[in-house]
Each structure stands twice: as C-alpha cells, then as structure tokens.
A protein has these predicted regions:
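Beta-loop-alpha module in the N-terminal Rossmann-like domain of NAD(P)-dependent dehydrogenases
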Residues: 61-82
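N-terminal Rossmann-like dinucleotide-binding module
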Residues: 3-56
Length: 82
C-alpha cells in the first residue's frame, strides 16, 4: 500500500512527442496539475523543439531530436503523442 501511495503522491514525469498546438494545450494543463510535470519533448524539427522547450522551461538534456531517446529515458514516466 505504501508503494502505491508514494507513486500516486509523486509527480508523473511527462514527455511529449510532437510540439504542435494540441501539445501546447496539454503542457498548459500540466502546469495546473498536482500530479504531473512536463519533463521532456521530442521533435525532429529543431526550431519547434527549442521554442517549445524554452516556453515550458524544459532542460536541454530532455529536448530530444529522436523519439526513441525520449521513449528510452528513465526520467520519463509517461508519453503524450501529439
């Protein structure tokens, strides 16, 4: 029971694949979440990846130019595909 409680009370670290308009809506909603935190972004488009990362204060090391790198990251718990 304690393990489940600790997981629920911790933040789910989200990654987003594809920083488009709907991804912005999702990222804005995460700002209001008690249990979710935006941790990473993956995009093949360098400009969009950097703009999205800057807007949502994503650390450079979690701005992936390859989808598999985001999916393989042990720092990402869940992925939203936009």
């Amino acid at each position: 029971m304690t393990l489940i409680f600790n997981f629920i009370m911790s933040h789910i670290r989200w990654g987003i694949i594809g920083p488009g308009n709907i991804a912005n809506n999702f990222a804005d909603a995460l700002k209001e979440s008690y249990s979710g935190k935006l941790k990473g972004i993956a995009s093949l488009n360098d400009k969009r990846r950097q703009e999205f990362g800057n807007k949502y204060n994503i650390e450079d090391e979690f701005r992936f130019n390859n989808y598999d790198l985001l999916l393989d990251s042990s720092d990402i718990d869940a992925v939203y595909i936009s």
